[in-house]
C-alpha cells in the first residue's frame, strides 16, 4: 500500500506533537539561562537553570536570598543592585550551597546590605538584632568572584566549605566608621579546607579575616582598611578547634587597630600549627603591629595565658610598616611551653613603642 505525501506529513506532525516535554534536568544540561527579579522566583526556579541572573532583586524583610542546593555546574550572576528590607533578625541575607558553583557579578552591580538601618555601635553585642550577610556553607569545589558588597549589617562572608576560591571581593563598609558599624568582619572561616581568598579589598570595623578552624587556607593579595587586621582565632571552645597550614601573604593592612594577630582562648583546648604571615605591609596601625596571645576570654584579653591551644610552626616574616606612637609594635603572651618552633625573620616596624609585658616568648621570636 502506498502512503501519500500528505499522509506522511500528517503522521510526522502527530509524532512531533506527541513528543514529551523536556524534563527540568534536561533543561539544565542543555544550558538554560534564567533571569529572576524577585527572591521568591529565584528560590522557586533555581533548580531549572544552569545560569541564573539575579536582576535588581529587592529581598523582602526577614527573608534570605536562597541559592542553596543548586545543581552542579550552576553559574549565578548578580546584576544591578541587590537590596534587603529591614527587620531585626539573625539572617543570613544571602545563602549559597552546592558543588561546582560559580558566583560572579556583572559590571556595575552592587549588593547593598543596608547596614545603616541596623548599625547602632553594638554589633552582635546587643542593641538591634542584626542579620549576617552571606553564608557560603557547603559550597564546595566552587568560586565566588568579582562581587561588590556595601554596608553589611554585621559579619560578611561566613565560610564553611571545602575547595572554595573567593577572588576580587570588595566590601565597602566605610560608612560604618561614622554611623556605628561594629563586628563587620569581612571573612570568617571555620571547619573548612582548601580555601583561597585572593585580591580582596576590604573597608570595615572588625577583622578583615578571622580563621577559627580549618586547614590549607590561603589569603593573598588583600588590602584591609579600618578594621582589626588579619587574625587567626580566637581559637577554642568550638566544635572544631584546629587551625593548620595557613598562608597569609603579600597583603596590606592600613588604618587598622592591629596588623596581624593570633589569639587563643583562656583555658580552652585545640591547636594552631603551620601558620605563615609573609610580606605584610602595615600603615597607621593604632594598637598592635604583631600580637600573639593565649589569654582571650569573652572576646577580650585577660593577661593570664594558658597552654591548652599550643601555637607551633608559626612563621612571621617580612612584616613591615608604621604604627601610631601610642601603638605597641610587638606583643607576645604565651602559656608555659605552648609556643615553640617559630620562625621570625625580616620584620621591621616603626613609630610605636616596645612592650614590657611579653611572656614566655619562644626562641627566635622578638618582642
From Swiss-Prot:
PbH1 repeats lie at residues 161-191, 192-213, 214-234, 243-264, 272-294. Residues 1-18 form the signal peptide. Its EC number is 3.2.1.15. One of its GO terms (cellular component) is extracellular region. SUPFAM superfamilies: Pectin lyase-like. It is found in: Secreted. This is Polygalacturonase. PANTHER family: ENDOPOLYGALACTURONASE B, POLYGALACTURONASE.
Amino acid at each position: 500500500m502506498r502512503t501519500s505525501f500528505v499522509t506522511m506529513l500528517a503522521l510526522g506532525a502527530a509524532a512531533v506533537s506527541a513528543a514529551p516535554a523536556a524534563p527540568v534536568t534536561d533543561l539544565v544540561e542543555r544550558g538554560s539561562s534564567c533571569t529572576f527579579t524577585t527572591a521568591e522566583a529565584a528560590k522557586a526556579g533555581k533548580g531549572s537553570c544552569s545560569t541564573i541572573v539575579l536582576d535588581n532583586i529587592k529581598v523582602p524583610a526577614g527573608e534570605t536570598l536562597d541559592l542553596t542546593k543548586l545543581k552542579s555546574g550552576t553559574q549565578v550572576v548578580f546584576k544591578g543592585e541587590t537590596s534587603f528590607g529591614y527587620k531585626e533578625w539573625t539572617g543570613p541575607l544571602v545563602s549559597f550551597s552546592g558543588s561546582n558553583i560559580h558566583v560572579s557579578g556583572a559590571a556595575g552591580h552592587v549588593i547593598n546590605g543596608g547596614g545603616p538601618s541596623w548599625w547602632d555601635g553594638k554589633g552582635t553585642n546587643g542593641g538591634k538584632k542584626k542579620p549576617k550577610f552571606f553564608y557560603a556553607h557547603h559550597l564546595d569545589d566552587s568560586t565566588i568572584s568579582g562581587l561588590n558588597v556595601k554596608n553589611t549589617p554585621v559579619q560578611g562572608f561566613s565560610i564553611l566549605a571545602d575547595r572554595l576560591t573567593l577572588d576580587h571581593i570588595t566590601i565597602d563598609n566605610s560608612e560604618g566608621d561614622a554611623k556605628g558599624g561594629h563586628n563587620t568582619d569581612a571573612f570568617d572561616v571555620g571547619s573548612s579546607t582548601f580555601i583561597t581568598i585572593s585580591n580582596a579589598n576590604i573597608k570595615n570595623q572588625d577583622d578583615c579575616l578571622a580563621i577559627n578552624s580549618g586547614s590549607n587556607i590561603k589569603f593573598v593579595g588583600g588590602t584591609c582598611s579600618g578594621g582589626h587586621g588579619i587574625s587567626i582565632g580566637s581559637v577554642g571552645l568550638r566544635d572544631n578547634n584546629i587551625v593548620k597550614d595557613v598562608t597569609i601573604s603579600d597583603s596590606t593592612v592600613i588604618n587598622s587597630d592591629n596588623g596581624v594577630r593570633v589569639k587563643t582562648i583562656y583555658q580552652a583546648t585545640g591547636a594552631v600549627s603551620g601558620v605563615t604571615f609573609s610580606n605584610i605591609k602595615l600603615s597607621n596601625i593604632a594598637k598592635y603591629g604583631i600580637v600573639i596571645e593565649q589569654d582571650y576570654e569573652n572576646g577580650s584579653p585577660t593577661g593570664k595565658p594558658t597552654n591548652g591551644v599550643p601555637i607551633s610552626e608559626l612563621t612571621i616574616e617580612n612584616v613591615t610598616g608604621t604604627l601610631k606612637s601610642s601603638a605597641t609594635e610587638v606583643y607576645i603572651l604565651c602559656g608555659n611551653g605552648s609556643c615553640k618552633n617559630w620562625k621570625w625573620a625580616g620584620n621591621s616596624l616603626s613609630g610605636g613603642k616596645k612592650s614590657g609585658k611579653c611572656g614566655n616568648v619562644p626562641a627566635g621570636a622578638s618582642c
